[in-house]
Regions:
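Short, charge-rich, low-complexity alpha-helical interaction segments
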Residues: 1-22
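Alpha-helix N-cap/N′ positions at the starts of helices
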Residues: 24-30, 62
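Non-membrane alpha-helical segments in proteins
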Residues: 30, 46-51
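Solenoid-repeat scaffolds in large eukaryotic assemblies
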Residues: 32, 43-45, 79-80
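Hydrophobic/aromatic side-chain positions at a characteristic register within alpha-helices
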Residues: 36-37
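Long, charge-patterned amphipathic interaction tracts in eukaryotic proteins
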Residues: 50, 54-135
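N-terminal accessory interaction module
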Residues: 101-192
Length: 192
């Protein structure tokens, strides 16, 4: 593992520990943390989201966005996205970030947002947005010949509605790409 990959993994581990800390019971939090420790992130995310829903625990918008990115990173967004979106909001903290369930907003052709050259088959699926300014983090998927979107995103695109400002593209193959894209939406728009 190269240094950059090790740093990205360590940073993701810190987010994981913070998310596990959302669970009030030490046994639950330890179970989720244990899943990270043994490399069973998919199972840990299922336990975490399941317990958040079962116990009707409040989840603020920042944690919900981190859960979404974590689920996307570990390939379980398709199974857990609905639950993540359904987690009870934290009434003590006004929501600035909104996580979209797949299908809540229609995918848009990438060529309508990104400069040329862009594949005509690439679609941007709105995923996380800033409620204040509308800045959107979208997952870029290929529209396959069988008329479905590719399972994994090729990249992450942060863009403003109406094309104000240049879009930023984060290639999935880059370490920490989804986290970097989330940071732009969370910290870079000035609404936070």
């Amino acid at each position: 593992m190269n240094d950059r990959r090790a740093q990205a993994y360590a940073a993701e581990g810190a987010v994981w520990a913070r998310l596990a800390g959302l669970l009030p019971g030490a046994d639950d939090a330890d179970e989720v943390q244990g899943c990270w420790d043994i490399g069973e992130q998919e199972a840990g995310l299922e336990v975490l989201v399941g317990r958040l829903l079962e116990q009707e625990l409040a989840v603020d918008d920042a944690a919900r966005a981190e859960l979404a990115v974590m689920a996307g990173q570990w390939g379980v967004w398709d199974r857990l996205g609905t639950g993540i979106v359904a987690c009870r909001p934290d009434p003590a903290r006004p929501a600035r970030l909104r996580v979209y369930e797949d299908g809540a907003e229609p995918p848009v052709p990438a060529w309508s947002v990104l400069p040329d050259p862009v594949s005509r088959e690439l679609r941007l699926v709105p995923w996380i947005a800033c409620a204040g300014c509308g800045l959107v983090l979208a997952r870029a998927h290929t529209y396959e010949e069988w008329e479905e979107l590719s399972y994994l995103a090729q990249s992450y695109v942060v863009h403003a509605p109406g094309g104000s400002g240049a879009p930023r593209v984060f290639e999935r193959a880059e370490d920490g790409a989804a986290w970097s894209a989330l940071a732009v939406v969370r910290d870079g728009c000035g609404c936070g």
